Amino acid sequence: MTNAQLFLNNSWADKSETMSGSGSTLANTKAVREHLPLLLEKYNIESMFDAPCGDGNWIQHVDLTCAYTGGDLVQKFVDANPLQSVVFDITLGTFPAVDLWMCRACLYHLSNVEIQLAIDNFKQSNIKYALITSHTGNSGGDIRTGSFRVLNLEEHNYFGLDAPIDQIPDVLFNNMQENLLLFVNPRITK
C-alpha cells in the first residue's frame, strides 16, 4: 500500500469538518493560526510551502502575508484545498523555491527512514527554514508509516537537525503539547 493510499484511508479524520484529521479542525488550530503570521513577519517570510497541506481546512483562515503553496500526497486533499496546492511527496519530490517549508502534524506518522528522507530532502533544497511539528514528551520508537508515536525533534539530535531557533505553540492533544519548531537549513547561510 502506498503512502497516499494509507492517508486516503484516513479513519482518523473528523469528517464533519475536515478530511485531514482532528488536528486540522479550527478548534485544534487556534494557537497556530494566531502565532503563524507573527513568525512569518518576524523572519521576513515571503513564500511558504505547506507540505503536507491536507484539505486546507485551517490554513485558509490564517492571515498569510506571504505567497502560499500547499503540497499533499493525496489528490483528493489537493482538489479540496481552496488555496493553491499540488500533489507532492516530501520524501521524494523536489521542493519549490520558497523561504519556508511548513511540515505540520506529519512526521510522527512516518517511519524513521521516511522522516530521514524528508529531512535530507529539505537539507538538499534551497529553502532557508523548516517549521516542523514536535512533541514535548519522550519520543517513542520507530513505527510503520501511517501509525503514530510521540516525536520530540529536540531529543538526541534527531535526524541531523541543528537546534531550533524558534517555536510557536500548536495544539495540546491528549495532555501533550505539540509545538512547531523553526529550523534553519544548514546549507543556507544568513
Show where each model-derived region lies.
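Class I (Rossmann-like) S-adenosyl-L-methionine-dependent methyltransferase catalytic domain
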Residues: 1-97, 110-190
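A conserved beta-strand element that flanks and buttresses the S-adenosyl-L-methionine
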Residues: 102
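Hydrophobic adenine-recognition pocket in adenosine-nucleotide-binding enzymes
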Residues: 106
